[in-house]
Amino acid sequence: HEPCGESCVFIPCITTVVGCSCKNKVCYN
């Protein structure tokens, strides 16, 4: 999995719309 360049510590991943998900406070695809 590659990082999406987004964190999800305080807010959910915006990048979920492009297939990313939150893992260990970082958004991965």
From Swiss-Prot:
Role this protein plays: Probably participates in a plant defense mechanism.
Covalent cross-link Cyclopeptide (His-Asn) as placed by the record, residue numbers: 1-29
Cysteine-cysteine disulfides: 4-20, 8-22, 13-27
Post-translational modification: Contains 3 disulfide bonds.
Domain of life: Eukaryota
GO terms of biological process kind: defense response
Keyword Disulfide bond: yes
Keyword annotations of the record: Disulfide bond, Knottin, Plant defense
Matching PROSITE patterns: CYCLOTIDE (PS51052), CYCLOTIDE_BRACELET (PS60008)
Record Pfam families: Cyclotide (PF03784)
InterPro entries assigned: Cyclotide, Cyclotide_bracelet_CS, Cyclotide_sf
Protein name in the entry: Cyclotide cter-K
